[in-house]
Each structure stands twice: as structure tokens, then as C-alpha cells.
A protein has these predicted regions:
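Conserved ABC transporter NBD signature motif
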Residues: 59-74
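Conserved ABC ATPase "signature" region
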Residues: 96, 100, 108-125
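ABC transporter nucleotide-binding domain
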Residues: 173-245
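Conserved ABC ATPase signature
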Residues: 129-133
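Helix-to-loop junction immediately C-terminal to a conserved catalytic motif
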Residues: 51
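Catalytic Walker B motif of ABC-type/P-loop ATPase nucleotide-binding domains
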Residues: 154-158
Length: 245
């Protein structure tokens, strides 16, 4: 399978702090690639490089066969973990404005936005001010704005934060549909259940070092024997056992 993103021997240092140390990964085209790791592992630095907010000290990033450059910015949609909308603007007005910043004409933006608003059953929010919406409602708007210019690469950083289970399932369905329609997706999270459900391939990173990388299926096969049994002794001397992976 052709790789859409190739990160080759990338390192980044801030002062004496090594944020990334000789990282190499390959993200197959039209796949969902999971970035896993604790806070401070290096996931955000990697995402910032893909968005060209910062540059590697060494190594290179290949974007769809070309060395990453400014022309690729319009082909990326990024939903950061820290989100924010202009509170006093109307929802529809702001969504059109943000779509135009991504190169979509006003007429086309309104057409695409109305499609997504109907799909998410939120068309009634169009003329409301952002400050009238709950956090979860605002995050739906930001998800829509992230995908509105139909980018080739989507980067989602903890996209389910703040959502109830119903809306989490709604977004999971949309993410899978976006992949099936041709998008390549990088999904940064701490949630292993979501990784198993959504991701084709993953990388586990910690302290700027790659710990493991591969397909979710292969990693599960490689580590399937890593289990243990917990024996719980109750006061009535009955014994219960629980199998853990």
C-alpha cells in the first residue's frame, strides 16, 4: 500500500529537552493511524511539524510523495485538543468565515455546511450565537469546520473529549466514512478502546522515543500471550478469578 505520510529520522530539541529522537513512521494512504502516548510523549510536537508550525532539527517529512512544504497546508484539516470559537458570532456566520479561510468560496461553503448541519441534525443552530451552545455542541461545529474543505489529510487530537457516548459513536461513524471516501487520518489519543475500534495502524511513543509501530491486528497477535490472572479471595473464602490482557 502506498504511504501518504513518511516521517524519516526526525528529531527535535527544545533547549536541553529532546522532544523527538530519531522518529520514523509510515502512514498508509486512506488509513487511520493512531498516535498513542502519555502527555509529553512527543505526539503534539509531531503534529505541529505536520502542520508546519515548527520544523524538525533533522530528518524529513514526505507528504504524498513530495517533501512537506507550504503548498500542502491547504490539504490538511486539523482538530486540536484545545479548541475555541468566537463566542459572540453566530454559528453559521462563523462556520462560513472559517471555511473561506481554508479556500472555500462563500457559496460553496454554505452549501457544504448546510449538508453537514443537516447530517448532524443541527441546522436549527445556524443563527444561534456560539456562546448559547454547550461545549459538546461547539465541538461538533469545529469537527465540521475541520473537514469542510475536504482535505487529503485529517489530524484529530482527542476528538471525542467532552462528548457523550451517543455523539462519540456518531463521530466514530463519520471518521470511518471519511477514510472510506479517501482521506488519510492521524488520530492522537490516550483511549485504547477507540484505537482498537478505529485504527488500522498505530505508533506508541514515550519520552520522544518510538516504542512500537505496526498494524493493530499484528500488534494484538504479537502480544496476545501477555495476560495475567487476578485471584480475589473474599471473606467467605470463595475465590473468584478475572482474566486481564
Amino acid at each position: 500500500m502506498q504511504n501518504f505520510i513518511e516521517i524519516n529520522n526526525v528529531s527535535k530539541t527544545y533547549g536541553t529537552y529532546k522532544a523527538l529522537n530519531d522518529i520514523s513512521i509510515k502512514v498508509p494512504k486512506q488509513s487511520i493511524y493512531g498516535l498513542l502516548g502519555p502527555n509529553g510523549a512527543g505526539k503534539t510536537t509531531l503534529i505541529r511539524m505536520l502542520n508546519q508550525i515548527t520544523a524538525p532539527d533533522q530528518g524529513e517529512i514526505i507528504f504524498n510523495g513530495e517533501k512537506l512544504n507550504r503548498n500542502h497546508i491547504s490539504q490538511i484539516g486539523y482538530l486540536p485538543e484545545e479548541r475555541g470559537l468566537y463566542k459572540t458570532m453566530k454559528v453559521g456566520e462563523q462556520a462560513i468565515y472559517l471555511a473561506q479561510l481554508k479556500g472555500v468560496s462563500q457559496k460553496e461553503a454554505e452549501k457544504r455546511l448546510k449538508y453537514w448541519f443537516k447530517k448532524f441534525d443541527i441546522l436549527s443552530w445556524w443563527d444561534k450565537k456560539v456562546e448559547e451552545l454547550s461545549k459538546g455542541m461547539q465541538q461538533k461545529i469545529q469537527f465540521i469546520v475541520t473537514v469542510i474543505h475536504e482535505p487529503q489529510l485529517l489530524i484529530f487530537d482527542e476528538p471525542f473529549s467532552g462528548f457523550d457516548p451517543i455523539n462519540v459513536n456518531l463521530l466514530k461513524k463519520e471518521i470511518l466514512e471519511l477514510r472510506d471516501k479517501g482521506a488519510t487520518i492521524i488520530f492522537s489519543t490516550h483511549n485504547m478502546a477507540s484505537v482498537e475500534e478505529l485504527c488500522d495502524n498505530i505508533m506508541l511513543i514515550n519520552k520522544g522515543q518510538k516504542i512500537l509501530e505496526g498494524s493493530v491486528y499484528q500488534i494484538k497477535q504479537d502480544f496476545k500471550d501477555h495476560s495475567f490472572e487476578i485471584v480475589l479471595r473474599q471473606q467467605d473464602n470463595k475465590t473468584t478469578r478475572q482474566q486481564e490482557d
